[in-house]
Regions:
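Conserved N-terminal phosphate-binding loop of PLP-dependent enzymes in the Aspartate aminotransferase
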Residues: 1-164
């Protein structure tokens, strides 16, 4: 979910990470069912025909998905990410303002255009134990209220709201 949502080079670019392997999902096929992977030369050389690991797929290189993916990737210019960041900051600011005004015990987690609202006494949710303490009933009520107002949020605070 982080392939191209936050930067042209994904979270790898954002956090300056150079992984051994990278996987990409639907975006690489313009939303069509396809995936891709890549990695360091010494790992990728293990794949056939150079290496002993055979890899194949029914839809590998599907022309429709590749064409759609190329079209989307060509559209993802830097200004798209700047605009998404501006909109995301506006939503985060509004949520925070509402949290303060209503004295709600909640926390917003956001990276680029991905965000979620946690109902919790904690200022940050960092691990599984923190997540176990989330007020899921409160989120369910909030979700229903927002839906009634025409705002579509993820049905669980364990899911992420995507603007991208």
């Amino acid at each position: 979910m982080t392939g191209f949502r936050v930067a042209p080079g994904g979270v790898q670019e954002l956090y300056n990470v150079n992984p051994d392997l990278t996987t990409l999902g639907k975006i690489i096929g313009g939303g069509l069912p396809v995936g891709a992977y890549g990695g360091k030369k010494e790992i990728m050389n293990l794949l056939a025909p150079e290496g002993p690991v055979y890899q194949a797929g029914t839809l590998s290189g599907n022309p429709l998905a590749m064409s759609a993916g190329l079209t989307v990737l060509n559209m993802l210019e830097k200004d798209v990410y700047i605009k998404l960041e501006e909109i995301s900051k506006t939503i985060e600011k509004g949520w925070n303002q509402n949290i303060i005004e209503t004295k709600t015990k909640a926390h917003i987690a956001r990276v680029g255009s991905m965000m979620t609202l946690f109902f919790s006494d904690k200022n940050e949710i960092n691990n599984y134990e923190d997540a176990l303490e989330l007020d899921t009933d409160r989120y369910a009520k909030y979700f229903k209220h927002m839906l009634d107002m025409g705002v579509y949020l993820p049905p669980s605070q364990y899911e992420c709201l995507f603007l991208s």
